[in-house]
A protein has these predicted regions:
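Sec-dependent signal peptide recognition
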Residues: 1-7
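C-terminal catalytic-base region of ester-bond hydrolases, centering on the histidine
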Residues: 160-230
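Surface-exposed beta-strand edges and their flanking turn/coil or helix-capping segments
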Residues: 72, 97-101, 156, 186-189, ...
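Juxtamembrane and targeting peptides
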Residues: 1, 17-19
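Active-site catalytic motif of lipid deacylating hydrolases and related acyltransferases
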Residues: 19-113
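Serine-dependent carboxylesterase/thioesterase catalytic core
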Residues: 77, 86-181
Length: 230
């Protein structure tokens, strides 16, 4: 009985720690699939354990994420040349506090030739702090519907968007229309707008698949259009 219980706990823990990207359902069971992502421990998780590639894709979620908004985008962007990862972090803390964790996790990966990072909302703020952290490896950083100019983050976290970036990094800002983004439309300024010349800025349209293109849908729209700029 003890052995059986131990095996049960072992497999249960493994299920929480390791998720397979293509076992996650973006459609009928999207809520349960989202929970599986958000139940992962804090850290960087390989969603394709059986694949060994030299390119990686990392999704960084925002605050109050339910996970499901990531399933379609990660599956859409993923291809046979890359491994897809999901970074779980404590969004109750300032983003600077999670930089050592993600950098330590990235440094453990061997043979990586290219990194693509997608940071959504608060996760984009964390991603922006990697502009001067990742060296040598070619890296594309995409921040999506992210409050990079947030007055609250500056006040409570001393967050100021970096002024420079490393030469190996390409930087892309994907901005929603503020008045239809419920995360930002109550503000008297657009917290997505910063002055950073070494980046490409893409303003998202107002509709996606016939619906309002708001905060959560923004990742899916980027997934459908990211190849246009690459």
């Amino acid at each position: 009985m003890k052995v059986y219980l131990l095996l049960t706990l072992t497999f249960f823990s493994f299920d929480l720690i390791c998720q397979n990207l293509y076992e996650l359902d973006p459609n009928k069971n999207y809520l349960d699939s989202g929970k599986k992502l958000m139940n992962l421990d804090f850290g960087l998780h390989n969603l394709e354990q059986d694949s060994k590639n030299t390119e990686i894709l990392i999704g960084i979620h925002g605050g109050d994420s339910r996970g499901f908004e990531w399933i379609y985008p990660l599956q859409k962007i993923d291809d046979d040349k890359m491994n897809t990862y999901f970074f779980r972090w404590d969004t109750t803390k300032c983003p600077q506090e999670s930089i050592p964790l993600i950098m330590n996790e990235i440094s453990k990966l061997e043979g990586i030739m290219k990194i693509t990072i997608l940071g959504h909302s608060f996760g984009g703020v964390l991603a922006s702090l990697l502009l001067n952290e990742i060296n040598q490896v070619k890296t594309d950083i995409h921040v999506i519907a992210s409050p990079l100019a947030s007055k609250d983050l500056e006040k409570y976290c001393d967050y100021i968007h970096p002024k420079t970036k490393n030469e190996n990094i390409s930087y892309f800002q994907w901005r929603t229309i503020q008045k239809i983004d419920f995360a930002f439309n109550n503000l008297d300024y657009d917290p997505q707008v910063i002055d950073f010349k070494e980046s490409s800025v893409i303003r998202l349209p107002d509709k996606y698949r016939g619906n309002r293109l708001g905060h959560l849908w923004s990742i899916s729209w980027v997934a459908d259009n990211i190849d246009v700029i690459n």
